[in-house]
């Protein structure tokens, strides 16, 4: 999620510019904005960075990469892109909304963060469709479910995400607000522009992909229940029932989708509510920052879900560790030999 965005929902400076003049509420929000929130985001940043690098490293070093591995690797890369912008966000919040890194970096960080939003939603949607065909229609679209074509599909999704984020590349800049604070924000001066952009971002990154994701997994659950009933009635092993490995992968993606909904829904609801508010209340302010924390927390939680829910990752990590250790021992032996 992009807290750098539009002038109507960027930082505490922007929200206070909407004539929110209650002294206690403002002081409370200021403490949250400059102390508590940067600390929380910093913890999320450090754990998410380690976890996602571990996932990407594990998949890249794996000898047998599966189609789901490619999607998971791209989601981990997207989470890393999300995390890269965190230190800049922390710095801006800690300084009361002031941006000191210049206009070009403001545009790059804001645009990459938005591109990441589009990419995460698109990859999650396509991965859900892939799980549906792998489980319910295993003999359809098999030519498209190869590793090579899956890589091309993911590259296409990233390219489309950059195109969809073009408005941010154009309009994100350093803006000087009425209180004199220069912040990195999305320069939308017209209320109509704010309305249309908010709807554009909310629909394309959440409300459009969400039904597709839910439909895929509802169909998967219906199919699984039907196969279970057939086996139970026939009292035999039906070869069409998904294998344990596929079921584990499906369970993993189901949990990831649940995390996607819980982390993204509050943020987008807050944006829609903000369109109707003249003066933000303390409750709105708290909800706004909680939604940002939830959105960034998902980038930290996802890699640990991959490890906990996937038997493949649990097996691969020790194997890769042994391979790396053996390689280091071999290199050390060669180094010692060269000195004697």
Curated annotation (Swiss-Prot):
Keywords: Cell membrane, G-protein coupled receptor, Glycoprotein, Membrane, Receptor, Transducer, Transmembrane, Transmembrane helix. It is found in: Cell membrane. GO terms for biological process: neuropeptide signaling pathway. The keyword Transcription does not apply. One of its GO terms (molecular function) is G protein-coupled peptide receptor activity. Specifically expressed in the brain with highest levels in cerebral cortex, hippocampus and hypothalamus, and lower levels in caudate nucleus, putamen and thalamus. Residues 1-34, 93-106, 173-198, 273-286 are extracellular. Receptor for melanin-concentrating hormone, coupled to G proteins that activate phosphoinositide hydrolysis. Belongs to the G-protein coupled receptor 1 family. This is Melanin-concentrating hormone receptor 2. It comes from Macaca mulatta (Rhesus macaque). The lineage of its organism: Eukaryota, Metazoa, Chordata, Craniata, Vertebrata. The gene is MCHR2.
């Amino acid at each position: 999620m992009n807290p750098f965005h539009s002038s109507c929902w960027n930082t505490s400076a922007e929200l206070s510019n909407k004539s929110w003049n209650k002294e206690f509420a403002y002081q409370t929000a200021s403490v949250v904005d400059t102390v508590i929130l940067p600390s929380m985001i910093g913890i999320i940043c450090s754990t998410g960075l380690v976890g996602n690098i571990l996932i990407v490293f594990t998949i890249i070093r794996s000898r047998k990469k599966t189609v789901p591995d490619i999607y998971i690797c791209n989601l981990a890369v997207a989470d890393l892109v999300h995390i890269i912008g965190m230190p800049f966000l922390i710095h801006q919040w800690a300084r009361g909304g002031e941006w000191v890194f210049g206009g070009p970096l403001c545009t790059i960080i804001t645009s990459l963060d938005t591109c990441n939003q589009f990419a995460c939603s698109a990859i999650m949607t396509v991965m859900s469709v892939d799980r549906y065909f792998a489980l319910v229609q295993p003999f359809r679209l098999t030519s498209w479910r190869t590793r090579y074509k899956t890589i091309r599909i993911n590259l296409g999704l990233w390219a489309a995400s950059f195109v969809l984020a073009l408005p941010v590349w154009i309009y994100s800049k350093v803006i000087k607000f009425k209180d004199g604070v220069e912040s990195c924000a999305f320069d939308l001066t017209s209320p109509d522009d704010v309305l249309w952009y908010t709807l554009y971002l909310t629909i394309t990154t959440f409300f459009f992909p969400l039904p597709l994701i839910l439909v895929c997994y509802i169909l998967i659950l219906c199919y699984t229940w039907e196969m279970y009933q057939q086996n139970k009635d026939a009292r035999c092993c039906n070869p069409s029932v998904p294998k344990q490995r596929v079921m584990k992968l499906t369970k993993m993606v189901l949990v990831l989708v649940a995390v996607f909904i819980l982390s993204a829904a509050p943020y987008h609801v807050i944006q829609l509510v903000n369109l109707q508010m003249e003066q933000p209340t303390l409750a709105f302010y708290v909800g706004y920052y909680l939604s940002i924390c939830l959105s960034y927390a998902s980038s930290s939680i996802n890699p640990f879900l991959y490890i906990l829910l996937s038997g493949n990752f649990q097996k691969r990590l020790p194997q890769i560790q042994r391979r790396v250790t053996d390689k280091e021992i071999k290199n050390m032996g060669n180094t010692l030999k060269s000195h004697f």
